[in-house]
């Protein structure tokens, strides 16, 4: 469970490392956030005003319980926000942080969601943190049936062990080529 990573400061540290890159991509200086397990919750945006105590104030102090791991429900809600509610005609980079693979029954559903969204303006950058195995996410790059490759994955056992340059390079490894492919397919403008 990711509970220990919230309590020991790992997730707070990851947020602090990701915020600078998110600020470069976001138009309003805020990073939208969700917490997920079997279900999900939309959380208040992360910004320069609240990032330093975000995990404590918005997650641990609110008593969110961490259960199993299902990606598809939260991915559908993320897509709903960016494709229906906000309807911005700009590419969207999702930094999807997880501490482990999803449950078996969620894998085909997640495959379906990724395929369905492969002709939309959303790129999924999955980031595995901690000591878990990520066999499902490692196979994601070879998922067939997509209009274009709309997802990438890397794992970092300890986010403190890599430099900002290394982290940003990993985060943006496939995003520029996705932008080019999405433009050539008329998915984004």
Predicted regions and their residues:
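Surface-exposed acidic, glycine-flexible loop patches that form ligand/cofactor-binding
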Residues: 24-25, 79-90, 114-118, 185-188
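Phosphate/oxyanion-binding active-site loops and adjacent basic polyanion-contact surfaces
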Residues: 7-14, 64-75, 106, 164-172
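DG-centered beta-turn motif at the end of beta-strands
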Residues: 1, 18, 90-105, 127-129
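Von Willebrand factor A/integrin I-like adhesion domains
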Residues: 46-49, 133-182
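VWA/integrin I-like adhesion module and closely mimicked acidic/polar interface patches used
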Residues: 101-144
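Von Willebrand factor
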Residues: 1-45, 53-89, 94, 104, 130-135
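Extended hydrophobic secondary-structure segments that form protein cores and membrane-embedded regions
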Residues: 32-37, 93-99, 125-128, 153-155
